[in-house]
Amino acid sequence: MDIKRSNQGAGQLVGETAESGQQRYPGRFSRRDFEAIAERAVLREPGQEPGREGAARAEALGMALDAGVRVDGRRLWDSLMELAKIGATPKGGVCRLALTDLDKAARDLIIDWGQQAGCSITIDQMGNVFMRRGGRNDALAPVLTGSHTDSQPTGGRFDGIYGVLGGLEVIRTLNDHGIETERPIEVVIWTNEEGCRFAPGMTASGVFAGVFALDYALGLHDMDGKTLGEELRRIGYAGETPCRRRPIHAAFELHIEQGPILEAEGLTIGVVTDAQGQRWYEIEMIGQEAHAGPTPMPRRRDALLGASRIVQLVNEIGLRHAPLACATVGMMRVYPNSRNVIPGRVFFTVDFRHPQDEILARMNDELREGIARVTAEIGLEAKIDQIFYYAPVAFDRACAQAVRSAASRLGYGHREIVSGAGHDACYLAQVAPTSMVFVPCVDGMSHNEIEDALPEWIEAGANVLLHAVVDRASEPG
C-alpha cells in the first residue's frame, strides 16, 4: 500500500522562499551557507580521482552539522505531547494497545505529519509504516530509523513513540536546513512491538527479519479471539507490500533507557552495544477443583499452591544469576476463581532475560526441573510452552561508533550500555547493521503511567540520532 499526497510547493525546500532560496531561520544557517561549505569541501585538486566527490559531499555534511545544525527540541516535545493525548490515562500515561482504534489514530496523525514533511508512505503486509525521504541517489540502500506506536495497558508517553517522532524530527530538521543526503532516509513504525495484546512481541519486525512466518504472525489472537490480521484489516493497515528483508545500509532506534543507569551516573546518552537475550513461557498447572470446606488439606491437588511455589522459584532463579539476570512472572489467571473452590487450573507467564545465552539455557533448565519437582510433590500436571526466544544481540560496531562519535561531537556525557529490554532493533540487527541510542528516564521507570523524561534528554537523543543518521546516509554507494 503506497500513500502519496500532493503538497503545494512540492520540491521546494521547507522554509525556502521561491524568489530567493535564501531565507534564514532563527539561529540557523541558510541554504547558501551550506552550499558555500559544500563548495569548499568538494573543490577538486588537479588530478583528483572522480570517486572523491561523494566522499567530499559526506565531509561537507559533517562540517555543516558540526557548524550548528540541531533538532528543534520544542517541536519534538510538542509532537510527543500531542501523541500522548491519544490514549491518555488519568495518571499521565497512555493505553494504546496494538491495532486498536487508538493505535490507528496515532498512526494516522504521524503519517499526516510525515506527508507534510514530504515523505512518501508505504505500508506492508504486517502494517509496518515506512516514511521515506529521498536522497541524492535513491537507488542506494536507505538508512532506517523508528520504533513503535503501541503501548502497554498502563504505558508511558515515551516508550516507542519517542523513536518514531525522533526519526520524524530528523527529517524535519534536514528539511529546515535544506540538507540533501546521499542515501534515502526512512522512518518506520513497527507493528505490535509490545506483545501485550498479541503475543509474542516484536512481531512485525520479526516477520521483516525472517524470524516469524507471515501466516503465523497474522494468525496471532488476543484474549477476545481477534486475530492480528483481522485487526489490521479492520483499521485499514493491511498493506500489500511484502513484509520481508531488503537492503538496509544502517539502522538506528532511539529509545528511553527503561532503566536507572544513565540517570544515576549523570549521563545523557547510552551507546547501546548489546541487548539481553529473552525466553518467554506460558505455563499451566493442572490439579483438581474441590470444595474448600470438606476437602482435607492432605488430599488437595491445589493448582494455585503449585503455581505459587513456581513464582517463588522464578524469583530465586533470577537472584541466583544476579546481577545480570532478570526473572519475572507478569500474568496469572486462576480457574475457576471462586472464593470457596480449590483452584483446579492456573495459567501464568514467565519472562527470563540475560546477556549470556548459556546462562539463559541454565535458567531454562532450572525452571523445568523445579516444575517437575513441585508437580510430583503436590500431584499436579504441568504444561510448559516456550513461546518466544531470541539470543543475546551484539549490535553493529560501526553503527555504535556513529552514535558514540555523535555524542562526543555534541558534548554529551555518554557510556556504553546493554539493553535490558527487547526492541525491534534486536530483530533488525539480524538482517542489517543496527544500533540504538538511549536517553535516561526519570527513576528508570517505564511500562508505567508515571514514565517520564526531561525535555533536554529528549532533545539530546534526537540530536545524536540526527548526526548518526546523516553520518551513515552520507556514505556513497
What are these regions (language model features)?
Residues 83, 145, 154-193, 279-285, ...:
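Alpha-helical metal-binding/catalytic segments enriched in His/Glu/Asp
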Residues 85, 89, 225-273, 311-316, ...:
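Active-site-adjacent substrate-binding region
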Residues 76, 86-89, 146-147, 414-464, ...:
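Zn-dependent metallopeptidase/amidohydrolase metal-coordination segment
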Residues 88-134:
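A non-catalytic alpha/beta surface segment that caps or lines the substrate-entry region
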Residues 30-33, 37-41, 291, 295-321, ...:
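His/Asp/Glu-rich mid-to-C-terminal helical/loop segments that flank catalytic regions of hydrolases
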Residues 60-100, 390, 447:
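N-terminal capping segment at the start of a domain
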Residues 192-193, 197-358:
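Midchain, well-structured core segments that form catalytic/ion-binding scaffolds
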Residues 98-99, 328-337, 349-355, 381-400, ...:
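A short beta-alpha structural unit
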